[in-house]
UniProtKB/Swiss-Prot annotation:
<comment type="subunit">
    <text>Homodimer.</text>
</comment>
<keyword id="KW-0443">Lipid metabolism</keyword>
<feature type="active site">
    <location>
        <position position="255"/>
    </location>
</feature>
<dbReference type="InterPro" id="IPR004655">
    <property type="entry name" value="FabH"/>
</dbReference>
<keyword id="KW-0276">Fatty acid metabolism</keyword>
<comment type="similarity">
    <text>Belongs to the thiolase-like superfamily. FabH family.</text>
</comment>
<feature type="active site">
    <location>
        <position position="285"/>
    </location>
</feature>
<keyword id="KW-0963">Cytoplasm</keyword>
<dbReference type="GO" id="GO:0044550">
    <property type="term" value="P:secondary metabolite biosynthetic process"/>
</dbReference>
<dbReference type="GO" id="GO:0033818">
    <property type="term" value="F:beta-ketoacyl-acyl-carrier-protein synthase III activity"/>
</dbReference>
<feature type="active site">
    <location>
        <position position="113"/>
    </location>
</feature>
<protein>
    <recommendedName>
        <fullName>Beta-ketoacyl-[acyl-carrier-protein] synthase III</fullName>
        <ecNumber>2.3.1.180</ecNumber>
    </recommendedName>
</protein>
<dbReference type="GO" id="GO:0006633">
    <property type="term" value="P:fatty acid biosynthetic process"/>
</dbReference>
<keyword id="KW-0012">Acyltransferase</keyword>
<dbReference type="Pfam" id="PF08545">
    <property type="entry name" value="ACP_syn_III"/>
</dbReference>
<keyword id="KW-0444">Lipid biosynthesis</keyword>
<dbReference type="InterPro" id="IPR013751">
    <property type="entry name" value="ACP_syn_III_N"/>
</dbReference>
Length: 329
């Protein structure tokens, strides 16, 4: 039995943080940001009473409506996030409560920007095994909650947002999720993209707050090089394993980290730029949210048709990375 994506949805907060807004906060300007990242604006969940679970709940309700399902039909909810409402309980459990999915079990998955692909793979295995028939997968992050807005290196990159899919048995074995390749590298990744404060190694204290250890840190140059290589390599591997040429691919859907990274991947793969999905200019890097947000936008604009070959690729902290081949049903 194959598993397929049967519905998509996304949620972007209404408030916009533009490059011009950042000019008032940082030593930067619109041209500098656009030339290095391709980002012009990003969405921010400003309401202090709303957290990641709120965005997930908005996505979950849309998914149910699109498939005309009751919340009680859902058997499993997986939320990929690095910005949970709190360390525990899992944000997925909060989502289960928000939508009334009383028959579902729920858990969070942390693989940073690769989180959605990791979570999607997990859902696929539950469906392929016959254990479940209706699994909800959501990637969401309120990155503004862990960004130091005095740090130009990170403040310009990230935004808030969520996207999700329903995974169900495919209508037939010719469509659905046809291949998955996932990887990790803790040796090279552990010190280059991280947030050190707040865990069991450095519990929250006056010292961790004073040292800004509760904000994200990244070695931008090293992460850039690693991301381009990893995503291009895994996309090529997926294509070779499935005898796909660049002409066969309807859309390459990469993690939306930086337009320069996206362009470099496309160039290395030889894929027509018209087939490379990009919305980073409008939303920035929403971490686990980027790929499902892209899928939902393609779907909403009627750009996905039966039999389309999609290659999804991502790279994130860990390092973690991977690719998934979907033939749209």
């Amino acid at each position: 039995m194959k598993a397929a994506i049967t519905a998509t949805a996304n949620y972007l907060p209404p408030d916009i943080l533009s490059n011009h807004d950042l000019e008032l906060m940082l030593d930067t300007n619109d041209e500098w940001i656009r030339s290095r990242t391709g980002i012009g604006e990003r969405r921010i969940l400003k309401d202090p009473t709303k957290a990641t679970s709120y965005m997930c709940g908005e996505v979950a309700r849309q998914l149910l409506e699109k498939r005309q399902l009751a919340a009680t039909d859902i058997e499993l909810i997986i939320v990929a996030t690095i910005t949970p409402d709190m360390p525990f309980p899992a944000t997925a459990c909060l989502v289960q409560d928000l939508i009334g999915a009383k028959n579902a079990w729920a858990f969070d998955l942390n693989a940073a920007c690769s989180g959605f692909l990791y979570a999607l793979n997990t859902a696929i295995r539950f469906v392929e095994s016959g254990a479940h028939k209706k699994v909800m997968v959501i990637g969401a992050d309120k990155m503004s909650s862990i960004i130091d807005y005095t740090d130009r290196a990170t403040a310009i990159l990230f935004g808030d947002g969520a996207g999700g899919v329903l995974v169900e048995p495919a209508a037939d074995d010719s469509c659905g999720v046809l291949d998955v390749r996932l990887y990790s590298d803790g040796t090279n990744g552990r010190e280059r993209l991280l947030m050190t404060g707040g865990g069991s190694r450095y519990p929250a204290s006056h010292e961790t707050v004073d040292k800004k250890m509760h904000y994200i840190y990244q070695d931008g140059r090293q992460v850039f090089k690693a991301a381009v290589t990893a995503m291009a390599d895994v996309a090529t591997e997926i294509m070779q394993r499935n005898n796909l040429t660049a002409d066969d691919v309807a859309y390459l859907v990469p993690h939306q980290a930086n337009q320069r990274i996206i362009d470099a991947i496309a160039e290395r793969m030889g894929v027509d730029r018209a087939k490379v999905v990009s919305n980073v200019g409008y939303y920035g890097n929403t971490t686990a949210g980027t790929i499902p947000i892209c899928l939902a936008e393609l779907d909403a604009n009627n750009k996905l048709k039966h039999g389309d070959n999609l290659v999804l690729v991502s790279f994130g902290a860990g390092y973690t990375w991977g690719g998934i081949y979907v033939k749209w049903q």
